[in-house]
Amino acid sequence: KGDFSMKTKAYTYPSASALATIHAWQWYPEDGNVKAVLLLHHGMAEHCGRYGDFLQAFADMGYAVFMHDMLGHGQSCETPEDRGFFGDKDGYNALLQDVRRLYDIARGEYPDKKMVIAGHSMGSFIMRCFTARYPDLDYAAAIYVGTGGPNPLANISVAVTNVLGAVKGKRYRSKWLENTGFKGYNDHFEGRTSVDWLSRDTASVDDYVADDACGFTFTVAAYGDLGRLMLECGSKDWYARVPKDLPILFVSGQEDPVSNYGAGIRAVSDRLKATGHTRVQVLLYPGARHEILRETNSPEVYRDIDAFITKAVLQAK
């Protein structure tokens, strides 16, 4: 929504799952003068179309931003039945392979520019896994937005989804599972809607509620994939594989239930530091909720992310 002046370029490629064609885009400055490349992954049950303000701000600051509608989301979804479904098995691996394809496109478009990888919410778990699976690719920093800490329920979640999938089918959508997964998220807030936890920006929350392509229920197979992603990026192996000298920024609202109100992000960042990672930074914004890129203080967040990239990547010796 709104009038945006940045330029765009579209791409399509087959998902590694063979379920759909992935739709991806590049947004870049009107004058074509690109200072750095940002590869950003959106979150669960949403799509790239929600990021217009972010994309305009970053194009104005000189970035070429690459995003794709994740498999089973937005335009990367062939039928309503495919929404929130990544495949009968190994869907989480397909998600990571689809990101690798977008990385290759972005790198091909800008072979000489510094690249930063980033993800919001579920996208942060995907990009955290991506960082450890592909530590030798040519990216200069990682930004994890609205991510979570160690989740003791992830193992149970995977087991439950396996059972439900076997009994009800992989595409079964369990309201019980959804309610359990997001239990308590909204208790902290006004209760104006069921998703007040997303943002203090009521217009943004209302847009989410009104958007048919947002807020849908995941299939049990996809919940299993999400659980596996969380297990992978919470494992000892993850901390061992993430490059020790990679600049890493965690960005979250202090009132974000996904990050356990900041405690989860602190736990991950502290463990990274304890395992020899020397360039870890945390930005927590008082009062802000989960969708920190669609918050009342988002312009401040955008400036802070740009400042991090400028210092850690563009001015780095």
Roles of regions detected by a PLM:
Residues 118, 127-213:
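Alpha/beta-hydrolase-fold enzymes
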Residues 6-29:
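N-terminal cap/lid segment of alpha/beta-hydrolase-fold proteins
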Residues 275, 279-317:
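Catalytic active-site module of serine/aspartate enzymes centered on a nucleophile-bearing elbow/loop
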Residues 110-121:
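Alpha/beta-hydrolase fold nucleophile elbow
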Residues 250-252:
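Short beta-strand/loop motif that positions the catalytic acidic residue
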Residues 42-46, 254-255:
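Active-site glycine-rich loops that stabilize anionic/oxyanionic intermediates
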Residues 87-107:
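Alpha/beta-hydrolase active-site loop
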Residues 57-81:
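Conserved alpha/beta-hydrolase
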